Curated annotation (Swiss-Prot):
GO BP terms in the entry: arginine biosynthetic process via ornithine; L-arginine biosynthetic process
Lineage of origin: Bacteria, Bacillati, Actinomycetota, Actinomycetes, Mycobacteriales
Keyword set, alphabetical order: Amino-acid biosynthesis, Arginine biosynthesis, ATP-binding, Cytoplasm, Kinase, Nucleotide-binding, Transferase
GO cellular component labels: cytoplasm
Top-level enzyme category: transferase
Site (Transition state stabilizer) residue list: 40, 257
CDD domains: AAK_NAGK-C
Domain of life of the native organism: Bacteria
Family: Belongs to the acetylglutamate kinase family. ArgB subfamily.
Keyword Protein biosynthesis tagged: no
Single Gene Ontology MF annotation: ATP binding
Name recorded for this polypeptide: Acetylglutamate kinase
Amino acid sequence: MPKIHDSSCTSGLTPSQRSHVLAEALPWLLHYRDKIVVVKYGGNAMIDDELKRAFAADMVFLRAVGARPVVVHGGGPQINMMLDKVGLEGEFRGGFRVTSPEVMEYVRMVLFGKVGRELVGLINEHGPYAVGASGEDAGLFTAEKFQPEIEGELVDIGRVGSITDVDPTSLFDLIDAGRIPVVSTIAPDDDGLVYNINADTAAGALAGALDAERLVMLTNVPGLYTDWPNKDSLVSSLTPAELEELLPTLDSGMIPKMTACLDAIHNGVKAAHVIDGRVPHSVLLELMTEGGIGTMISSESYEH
């Protein structure tokens, strides 16, 4: 059965939590040494200045202790602001952004030119560590047009794609050089048309291709709820089989994240985590403490 989370672990970074990080960190520091950790950067952590800096510091910390972090990001709020600024109406169908060729140019500009560059800059305030990349670079991602089924019919939503292939060679080169790749989720198809890729999906696919130790998803909730909005239903850990059983019952916004976690695990990732990006240093609190602060999906007998 899924393990229910102690909600007291979801508060902010208190002095007690800091002391626990110090006391519990050693075995986890050893565990993650030379291991790849893919982190999907999203939610409030992307728009709050304090959280942005805390996240960047977490990535530098992981690198400093010998782990190999890779960041994958989207940029929904920033894209919305840009489209509003230039007078383009943001249209959604079935929860998916309709992405015309004109909108795609702004998506590309915002993801790689704004969101990615900003995070690279924040990380590099600590040293020359981060390098920006996109799915277009060195064949990292190959995509095809994605058409969702809405009310029983396939719908054309423009330049929205799904990943058909991942070639992580260029990222391995960066990782081996001690860099922190920051990946924007845009990708070309075989004909060179560029598509916007769901960042959750891209992070899951990339984690599998990199043979990552962990996949970490930042969200705006403390973790996975089996009965949203019942806060007592927050789950601390569960197996892939348990998650597959729960998947059809979950809130629609959580399904892409959970599907990406399952895909990553099915492709060899040891464990996936869904955490609250509104908590400063949430990545370290999840990975470097015994209890963690979010939800872990793993078929192995890891402590959280």
